[in-house]
A protein has these predicted regions:
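Bacterial N-terminal signal peptides that target proteins for export
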Residues: 1-9
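Active-site metal-binding motif and surrounding structural segment of the metallo-beta-lactamase
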Residues: 55-57, 67-112, 217-220
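Binuclear metal-ion centers of metallo-dependent hydrolases, dominated by the metallo-beta-lactamase
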Residues: 235-256
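Conserved beta-strand hairpin/beta-sheet module of binuclear metal-dependent hydrolase folds
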Residues: 30-75, 176-190
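Metallo-beta-lactamase
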Residues: 23-26, 30-32, 57-59, 65-66, 118-241
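Divalent metal-coordination and catalytic microenvironments
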Residues: 35, 52, 62, 77, ...
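Hydrophobic h-region of N-terminal signal peptides that target proteins for export
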Residues: 11-20
Length: 256
């Protein structure tokens, strides 16, 4: 694993901590369309997750930052449906995607991930919690809660209404996209957002290749939900992020 913290990342975290505090940290659940809801989690560094309300149960995509944020999300879900939360997908091994595991397990949900995410959680969880605490000292020291069920690669939940897709390393080695075919929506996870964001754990050699593979799938989605900052974007977000990666690469080359 790379060095624990970078000065630019500390600066970024500090700025976002001030913004989040000013906005009164909270969980906001907003309908998108069909079965889908967008979660905006204003705690720590703002992150966006998703909720799929199926015929008989609810699937949460991204466990949010902590057991407390997970509880707040569950409360919001309870306002829109009496259906139980039965599955929670850890979309990568970082705390913003797996920190709420303990709460969800306690209410009876199964934690789901790829084998790779499960392996990385078991090896790096304590280190990742300390990493977050460098930028956010109030972040709790959470024990590892590993997934209950894992998959070797791509998987489907909710009778195919929720499709997890792994295409290669990007923001992390293990990050997945989640596609919702009926709603023509894609959850971009931490892989896609309007800013470059934290690249301390990114594979900058493979990142653009992974995004090109996503484009080549021609999934036909009309909405991308970004993992951080503003949630709602069109398919053009992929090319926008590719441009950000390319500009960073040119800047690095120019400095040599």
């Amino acid at each position: 694993m790379k060095r624990l913290i970078s000065t630019p990342f500390v600066f970024l975290l500090g700025l976002n901590a001030l913004v989040s505090a000013a906005e009164n940290p909270r969980i906001v659940l907003t309908p998108l369309r069909g079965h889908l809801y967008v979660v905006e989690d204003y705690f720590y560094l703002k992150e966006n997750s998703m909720v799929y309300v199926g015929d008989s149960s609810v699937t949460v995509i991204g466990a949010t930052w902590t057991p407390e944020t997970a509880r707040l999300l569950a409360d919001e879900i309870g306002k829109i449906t009496p259906k139980p939360i039965t599955e929670v997908i850890d979309t990568n091994y970082h705390p913003d995607r797996a920190g709420g595991n303990a709460y969800f397990r306690n209410i009876g949900a199964k934690i789901v991930s790829t084998n790779m995410t499960n392996d990385l959680l078991k090896v790096h969880w304590t280190e990742m919690v300390r990493y977050v605490q460098k930028g956010f000292p109030s972040y709790p020291t959470l024990p590892l809660v590993a997934p209950d069920k894992t998959f070797a690669g791509n998987f489907e939940l909710q009778d195919g209404g929720v499709r997890a897709i792994y295409l290669g390393p990007s923001h992390t080695p293990d990050g997945i996209f989640v596609f919702f075919p009926k709603e023509k929506a894609l959850y971009g996870n931490c892989i896609l957002k309007e800013q470059l964001g934290n690249l301390d754990f990114a594979d900058l050699t493979e990142y653009a290749k992974t995004l090109q593979k996503l484009k080549q799938l021609n999934l036909g989605f009309t909405t991308i939900v970004a993992g951080h900052w503003s949630p709602l974007h069109g398919p053009e977000l992929i090319d926008q992020y590719l441009q950000l990666l390319s500009a960073k690469d040119r800047s690095k080359s120019g400095a040599n």
